[in-house]
Design a protein with these regions (language model features):
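Active-site and donor-binding regions of nucleotide-sugar-utilizing enzymes
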Residues: 1-137
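Conserved catalytic-core segment of nucleotide-activated headgroup transferases in glycan assembly
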Residues: 1-13, 130-201, 280, 284-287, ...
Length: 342
């Protein structure tokens, strides 16, 4: 999106709470990045915005600390993952004026919540998924390995339902014994919230030459190397599936949806339903036989077809998300200015 504004020579103010945001490295002329601090410092700044159109990846507008500014004409939220739009905390998207989607399927549940809660209808526009567009280009440029060894990528979510925190050694010990290359890529939040657990596991496998821990910012190098992924319900499953088109093994667990918008839908989420169709379920009682499970996890025609359907459903307008987002923002600003007679 920033590249698109720069290409069109249109000025954009870009606020970030990441002091080392990659945007600062781009040397843009028209895009002006600014670090606004973290936590309350950032919220104070955001609550005093003055702009025609504000685009955010942060949910929860007008729910907790993040408030609408009277000097902003239009608040838009852009989804940054191709999974369900209702997996935010309660009322996560209720008070935005528009939501930019990765796939048309996300409209149905948002419209259901609007009707059920009797709230103002939002503009729901399918633009695509900008970060997947970028990763797709990057992953193409990574050369194939000359002497590739079979590689398993363990890439979980964080918290009590994440496979690392819940199962840890029970899963990793049998994997280590296979002799295959094992890449463990913890969720970024785990480094902050589950450091003790990670330190324990890293110490346990420090002498295993076939186990590598990946904390790099970009996940594409591990995704490219992996022949199969083991995860839970982490969103990275869809990154791997859509970018690499390879089989996925998932460890299912109960997820308490009560704190999330999804709970009010009263039905199974698209991402859970889809994972059952395109993934291979792994039960805890099969951990000891994980080598056999992986060997038998043949990439059937049916699984391949389900991955294709999922990609077509959740990642629309491939390669055009940045352009579509900028088009929307410019057109929205122009229409708002026209209404005010400017």
């Amino acid at each position: 999106m920033c590249d698109e504004f720069e290409k069109r020579q249109i000025e954009l103010t870009y606020y970030t709470s990441a002091e080392k945001d990659p945007c600062f490295e781009q040397n843009y002329k028209y895009v002006k990045p600014e670090f606004i601090g973290e936590g309350n410092m950032a919220f104070v700044r955001l609550n005093m915005l003055s702009a025609g159109v504000v685009l955010m990846t942060t949910p929860g507008l007008q729910v907790y600390q993040l408030k609408r500014s009277k000097n902003v004409k239009h608040y838009s939220h852009v989804l940054h993952m191709p999974n369900d739009a209702t997996t935010y905390r309660l009322f996560g998207l209720d008070y935005f004026d528009s939501v930019l989607l990765t796939g048309d399927y996300q409209k149905t549940d948002l419209q259901y919540l609007e009707n059920a809660r009797n709230i103002t209808k939002k503009e729901l526009v399918t633009v695509g998924c900008s970060y997947l567009d970028i990763l797709a280009e990057k992953i193409k440029s990574i050369p194939e390995e000359d002497n590739h060894n079979f590689t398993v990528l363990v890439s979980p979510s964080w918290g009590s339902v994440g496979v690392l925190s819940k199962y840890g050694e029970k899963l990793l010990d049998p994997l280590a014994k296979t002799g295959w290359n094992i890449i463990i890529r913890p969720h970024p939040q785990s480094k902050k919230s589950e450091k003790e657990m990670l330190d324990r596991l890293e110490a346990r496998y420090k002498d295993n030459a076939n186990i590598v821990w990946d904390y790099e910012r970009d996940n594409i190098y591990s995704l490219k190397k992996a022949d199969i992924m083991i995860s839970d319900f982490s969103g990275i499953i869809f990154d791997y599936t859509f970018l690499c088109d390879k089989p996925v093994i998932y460890v299912a667990d109960y997820i308490d949806l009560r704190p999330y918008d999804a709970y009010d839908l009263g039905k199974e989420l698209w991402q859970f339903e889809t994972l059952k169709k395109m993934g291979i379920k792994l039960d805890e009682n099969n951990f000891e036989n994980i080598a056999e499970v992986i060997k038998n996890a043949s990439d059937s025609k049916e699984l391949s077809e389900q991955r294709k359907i999922a990609k077509e459903t959740a990642w629309m307008n491939i390669g055009n998300a940045g352009k579509n987002i900028v088009d929307f923002m410019i057109q929205k600003e122009e229409s708002l200015s026209k209404k005010e007679g400017k």
